[in-house]
From Swiss-Prot:
Lineage: Bacteria, Pseudomonadati, Pseudomonadota, Gammaproteobacteria, Enterobacterales
NCBIfam families, per database record: PRK15490.1
Domain of life, per lineage: Bacteria
Annotated Gene3D superfamilies: Glycogen Phosphorylase B
Name of protein: Vi polysaccharide biosynthesis protein VipC/TviE
One GO-annotated biological process of the protein: carbohydrate derivative metabolic process
PANTHER family the UniProt entry points to: GLYCOSYLTRANSFERASE
Length: 578
């Protein structure tokens, strides 16, 4: 006969399998079916709490632990304390475990001692008591970084450009991924050619360190391109050997701090420190907040002398869906470490980060994107046929207004549909072209149909022929709520199309106001009347010109060429921060 313990063990294995298969809802349903709360022994309730916690049903698990603790179940105290500690609630765990019965306290003394050590250390470093409910993993991360506040980075190469690694989360199809790939390719070419960048001879290969390149998640969009250019690529997710051993850390205090970090920091340290030590990097440039959280402390432990933190969009305190409580203490601590500074691709983002983190402007540098003029030749006959069919349906149109964006909330696609409807009221001889795909595309098309303008809008979908579609437009419009530095505004001008944009991110830095485009008043609520007025002006401006004006051409050449981007990047990272 199968015992209760054996049944519970089998259920635990099944739940683990379902979790690995990402079938969490199915796992929860199974747990509730097999272990109905009203008929549980103490052992079964304890195991149910464990299983629920393991499938991310944290609140329900904690409620069960508290029910058992109310019944003076010391094993529940221990299990609850252990899980609280591992999630960063060391003070909560300490309070719970201190209350175990005197008769069994010895059983849990080692674990309580471990909790007491980290709490005592953190309170000493903070100079104050830490209240219950505080995430102690974040405090430990902060002080692990501050351990290096008096470090003396080794001297950087003089007269040559040393060994560089560029790090980010993936090589998907995003703008940051395009820029980091382009940068790696250009430096790799100079290395093969034994050339110079900004007067510095490139004597070392460049490496891309990427968290994950899973094809099924489309995280490898630029991988083929960088490999063809002989860029070395390391995928962190595939590192299985030569992992970090904290026994190599001499300071007992630092070792204790490293034992109580946020999981993503632990992951970066475990997988990357040995590799970074082996590579003996001179410079490390880490792009995007999530990668900075994973890699920055690992780089300090490995002794990388020059660390640059790449900020590609507005801070997570503005883009709430990207917010993590680790970011603010992470960046504020890193800002005081010698050899570390911040880099962005526009001044708007640096101002927002500086205001949020209460840091001086000297901590930030700007490297504008390097943008290649888009090809206006289609990659196949398909775009041309689509365009011909659309022009046949809209033969009365003498003006084409368009946009290129993902159909997601941040890009505000419904404002685009509303603009088209408003503009058509006074300019019926207008057609519209929208390039891009996303979760809200079908809803945007439905909105256009409801407004009676679906026949006037060509929804191209995702396309590699962006240049072809841009050169069909008389005016380009971007209604984004949030941006970093939108390359598409630059690309539109490169093919001679004037632009209108919200002031999202660095959009206003992409063109000359009143010459090659206009900025709207507000990024969150689009002023459609203002957008219509600007569109009228630019349509007339476009008709009076033949191509891009010299002033705009010079502006784009001086700010957004790939050569300028690479040169500025090397200049910023090849010297120690001020």
């Amino acid at each position: 006969m199968i015992t209760q313990e054996e049944k519970l063990a089998a259920l635990g294995k099944t739940c683990l399998t379902l979790k690995q298969e990402k079938k969490l809802a199915q796992a929860v349903a199974l747990i509730d079916s097999e272990l109905p709360t009203e008929a549980l022994t103490s052992l079964a309730m304890l195991k149910k709490a464990e299983f629920l916690h393991d499938v991310n049903e944290t609140e329900r698990a904690y409620a069960l632990y508290e029910t058992l603790i109310a019944q003076n179940n010391d094993e529940a105290r221990y299990e609850y304390a252990r899980r609280l500690y591992n999630t960063g609630l060391a003070k909560d765990a300490q309070l719970i475990l201190k209350k175990v019965s005197n008769g069994v306290q010895k059983k849990y003394n080692n674990y309580l001692g471990k909790i007491n050590k980290i709490c005592d250390l953190l309170e000493r470093l903070e100079g104050k008591a830490i209240p219950v409910g505080t995430n102690t993993c974040i405090i430990a991360m902060k002080h692990a970084i501050l351990f290096y506040r008096n470090r003396q980075p080794r001297q950087l190469p003089v007269g040559s450009f040393g060994r560089l690694a560029l790090c980010t989360g993936s090589l998907g199809s995003g703008g940051a991924e395009r820029q980091i790939s382009r940068l790696a390719i250009e430096i790799a070419r100079k290395y093969r050619q034994k050339g110079k960048i900004g007067g510095l001879k490139v004597e070392e290969p460049v490496e891309l360190i990427i968290r994950s390149l899973t094809p099924e998640l489309r995280q490898d969009f630029f991988l083929k391109e960088v490999l063809e250019e002989q860029v070395e690529v390391l995928e962190i997710a595939k590192i299985t050997g030569n992992l970090f051993d904290d026994a190599t850390i001499e300071s007992p205090e630092l070792r204790l701090l490293l034992s109580h970090l946020p999981p993503v920091c632990k992951y970066g340290i475990k997988h990357l420190v040995p590799h970074l030590c082996e590579r003996k990097l001179d410079y490390l440039s880490v792009w995007q907040d999530s990668a900075c959280l994973m890699i920055a402390l690992a780089a300090l432990i490995a002794g990388v002398p020059r660390i640059q933190l790449g900020l590609r969009g507005l801070p997570p305190v503005v883009r709430k869906r990207l917010f993590k409580p680790e970011y603010e203490p992470l960046y504020q601590a890193l800002a005081v470490v010698p050899g570390v500074d911040f880099m962005s691709n526009n001044h708007c983002v640096t101002r927002h980060y500086a205001d949020w983190l209460k840091l001086e402007a000297k901590h930030f540098q700007v490297v504008y994107n390097g943008v290649l003029p888009p090809s206006t030749e289609p990659s196949s006959e398909v775009p041309h046929k689509i365009w011909q069919q659309f022009t046949q349906k809209t033969q009365d149109a003498d003006t084409t207004i368009g946009g290129v964006f993902r159909f997601v909330g941040d890009k505000n696609p419904f404002a685009w549909i509303d603009f088209a409807a408003r503009y058509l009221q006074h300019h019926p001889a207008t057609r519209f072209v929208l390039v891009g795909d996303g979760d809200l595309r079908a809803e945007a098309q439905k909105r256009a149909e409801q407004l009676g303008i679906l026949e006037r809008i060509l929804f191209v979908g995702a396309s590699r022929d962006v240049g072809y579609w841009l050169q069909k437009m008389n005016v380009f419009i971007l209604f984004s709520r949030y941006e970093g530095l939108p390359n598409v505004l630059i690309e539109a001008q490169m093919v001679g199309v004037p632009v209108i944009s919200t002031p999202a991110g660095g959009s206003a830095e992409c063109f000359i106001e009143g010459v090659s485009g206009f900025i709207l008043d507000d990024a969150q609520t689009v002023n459609l009347d203002q957008a219509c007025r600007y569109a009228e002006k630019l349509v007339n401006l476009w008709r009076s010109r033949t191509g891009i004006c010299q002033q705009t051409q010079s502006f784009l050449q001086e700010r957004f060429t790939v050569e300028h981007m690479v040169g500025t990047f090397v200049k910023t990272i090849a010297s120690q921060p001020r």
